[in-house]
């Protein structure tokens, strides 16, 4: 069987951190690669929150749109190998978010998102069952942002994804790292850009 490839020029450390978190949350997570620009690859990874996370690296992918096991990709990045595993295209849940066209709606201070996540975690501990936090908590809208006639709700699942994937800097992070998140929208898609990656959610049609 053929093997997919990804050659990384820079950004491997950040991608490794995201993949390690994603695999820690879901050992069966799937990664998908898009050649965003001639020398930039956007790596998407599934999460248990019905949210797709993404991070960009400088490099080239052997086959644009290829999907592989996130665990296989993680091991390859750790080892510095270009071979990243066998194709898993059939396991990817739906379409990728658009590559461009998103409208910036608002900028949120990191501490606001962290406070929301803390409250959400407390509720999750209080009401979680054997299957984890209840679906109603994940769907709950915790913020509404709007600009130029466009309004979107931010569900708790996006907040949980940002914090559980380590996309938000901690208090000890260097001061040159931004302390805000940007919320953007395009059609049914909502995107939150954090300092260490982005998360996407389809607001009207579930990815999973």
What are these regions (language model features)?
Residues 1-57:
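N-terminal ordered "arm"
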Residues 44, 52-60, 199-207:
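Short amphipathic beta-strand/extended segments with alternating polar/hydrophobic composition
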Residues 52-85:
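A broadly used, surface-exposed interaction patch
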Residues 73-208:
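Long, compositionally biased intrinsically disordered terminal regions
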């Amino acid at each position: 069987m053929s093997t997919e490839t990804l050659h990384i020029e820079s950004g491997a450390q950040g991608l490794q951190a995201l993949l390690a978190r994603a695999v820690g949350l879901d050992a069966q997570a799937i990664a998908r690669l898009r050649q965003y620009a001639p020398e930039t690859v956007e790596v998407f990874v599934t999460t248990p929150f019905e949210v797709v996370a993404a991070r960009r690296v400088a490099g080239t992918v052997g086959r644009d749109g290829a999907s592989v096991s996130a665990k296989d990709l993680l091991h390859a990045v750790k080892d510095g190998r270009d071979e990243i595993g066998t194709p898993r295209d059939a396991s990817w849940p739906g379409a990728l978010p658009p590559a461009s066209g998103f409208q910036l709606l608002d900028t949120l201070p990191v501490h606001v998102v962290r406070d929301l996540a803390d409250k959400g975690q407390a509720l999750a501990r209080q009401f979680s069952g054997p299957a984890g936090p209840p679906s109603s908590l994940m769907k709950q809208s915790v913020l509404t942002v709007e600009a130029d006639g466009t309004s979107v709700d931010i569900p708790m699942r996006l907040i949980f994804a940002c914090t559980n994937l380590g996309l938000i800097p901690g208090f000890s992070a260097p001061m040159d790292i931004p302390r805000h998140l940007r919320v953007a929208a395009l059609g049914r898609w909502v995107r939150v850009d954090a300092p260490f990656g982005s998360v996407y959610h389809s607001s009207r049609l579930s990815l999973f």
